[in-house]
Every structure is written in structure tokens, then in C-alpha cells.
Amino acid sequence: MAKKVQAYVKLQVAAGMANPSPPVGPALGQQGVNIMEFCKAFNARTESLEKGLPIPVVITVYADRSFTFVTKTPPAAVLLKKALGLKSGSSKPNKDKVGTVTQAQLRQIAETKAADMTGATIETKMKSIAGTARSMGLIVEE
């Protein structure tokens, strides 16, 4: 018989840098999960990724206090900032533009995030990421 699910915990944790301090410790401690076991497993799974890149993770906690987790791809905004070498987006995206993103960069980010996004084709995923880029104050090349 399948294990009974007690809770789902959604977090964003830096790749290869999970430790028991907030936000990981309190979120998992409330559910009675072995925090160090999660940290070691998460760090092992994300060691191939760029250290410090925020990785969304969904942790499924079962009634017997065991857990499984699924890592997702980094948020589109983080990938856009990394691709353009920006520290942050614009505080006034409608007035101040902070950079320009090309169609090739959009396609690369859409392909990276393809597994975690809805949308039938890569073009629809590119449009979604272009919307994120515009909301950050980036100019999207046509």
C-alpha cells in the first residue's frame, strides 16, 4: 500500500548549499523530517549545478516522517539575470530599461525550463519567458 502523505513543503534552496538554518530547518522541522538527511541528499543531487543558483524543491513528507523530493529548474527571472549578467531587474520596468534579451537567449532559457513549464511548443514557452523579461525591465528583441 502507498504511504500516507502528511504534507508538501515547497522551498527555494541554493544549489549545493542546503543547511539546517532558515528556511530549510524550520520548514522541515515542523514536519518532523530529519533535516540533515534532506540537506545531504539535496546537496548531492544539485552538485552538478552552479553553486548558489536558487533551485525550487517540492518535498513530500509522509506520515512515517520519511520524505521524497523533486527539484525543479531555476526561476526564469534568475536565468534571465544570469544570461545578461545583471544584478537585478528594473525597479520601474515601464520606464527604466536595464538590458536587452535576444530571441536566441529566450530560446535557450525556454529549453532549459521546458520540463517545468506548461505550453505546447517551445515558442509558447519563449513568449512566457519574454513576458517575465518585460516585467523585469528588459527589452525583448523581435
Swiss-Prot record:
CDD domains: Ribosomal_L11. The keyword Amino-acid biosynthesis does not apply. One or more lysine residues are methylated. GO terms for biological process: translation. Keywords: Methylation, Ribonucleoprotein, Ribosomal protein, RNA-binding, rRNA-binding. It comes from the Bacteria. InterPro entries: Ribosomal_uL11, Ribosomal_uL11_bac-typ, Ribosomal_uL11_C, Ribosomal_uL11_C_sf, Ribosomal_uL11_N, Ribosomal_uL11_N_sf. The keyword Cell membrane does not apply. Part of the ribosomal stalk of the 50S ribosomal subunit. Interacts with L10 and the large rRNA to form the base of the stalk. L10 forms an elongated spine to which L12 dimers bind in a sequential fashion forming a multimeric L10(L12)X complex. Belongs to the universal ribosomal protein uL11 family. This is Large ribosomal subunit protein uL11. It comes from Glaesserella parasuis serovar 5 (strain SH0165). The lineage of its organism: Bacteria, Pseudomonadati, Pseudomonadota, Gammaproteobacteria, Pasteurellales.
